[in-house]
Amino acid sequence: MMVYEISLGSGSGRKRSESKEVVTLNSKSVRKIFIVVLAIKPHNFTLEFEQEGEKVKTRKVAFVTGASRGIGRACAVALAQAGYDVAVSARTMIDGTAFLDDGVTPVPGGLDTTVDQIRAAGQEGHPIQMDLLDRDSVIHAADEAIEHFGRIDVLVNNAIYQGPGAMLTIEELDDTNLKQLFEGNVFAQLGLIRHLLPVFIEQGGATIVNMISATAFINPSEKIGSGGWGVGYAMSKSAFERVAPLLMVEHGDE
């Protein structure tokens, strides 16, 4: 089992430890992310098994969370272009039905349009509604992906919590905001990994890609509103950054 982190921010890719690769990319380069990841992982998951004396290739399947728009959509499409069928999850199923907190300003993107792009790449896409703050929803999404495709070869933990608390100062941040940030940026993703680990081990391995942020390991040069970020967001991303190396130590040989 291989575990990778991809950090979105400025700077070039760099290896941060022997147990994982961290690829740092500008957000404009997200469509190249999985060209990099698929190139450096040790096997390509083109699996074969014997059936009545003939070798039969199995499908390659990826599960990308937070794929209704932006980085998640770009990852899902890149994987489809690399030959993967892709299960995609997000809160927004239909493009044009999501709005900002004001309830008026629309947010473009939905799983329906992501699946259209996956199919345009010649692969099967399967949309699943998922809310990071609802643990039952997260587990259901994993189960539905497995039920539909039969396996998951690549898990991309891209979805993050985007809501109150992310851009608050230390003085402004309260426990409720902090708990939401950790549920949506750490606990949900870790819960998804833990739920799928037995599946990955039984099927003989998988590749896990954790999307993190440069806020996990660098200090802001300015305050919030001038290029800086909230302490709660940075704390949650830093906590999630610790998952990959430990996961690699515990299960890297499986």
What are these regions (language model features)?
Residues 153, 171-190, 205, 209, ...:
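Catalytic Tyr-X3-Lys loop
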Residues 49-149, 163-169, 173:
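Short-chain dehydrogenase/reductase
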Residues 65, 130, 152-162, 185, ...:
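Rossmann-fold scaffold of SDR-type NAD(P)-dependent oxidoreductases
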Residues 79, 86, 151-153, 241-244, ...:
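Conserved Rossmann-fold SDR core element
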Residues 59-60, 123-124, 151-152, 200-214, ...:
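Active-site loop of short-chain dehydrogenase/reductase
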Residues 161-162, 175, 207-253:
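Catalytic loop of short-chain dehydrogenase/reductase
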Residues 75, 84, 145, 159, ...:
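Conserved alpha-helical elements of the SDR catalytic core
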Residues 147, 184-202, 216, 248-253:
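Amphipathic alpha-helical dimer-interface segment in Rossmann-like NAD(P)H-dependent oxidoreductases
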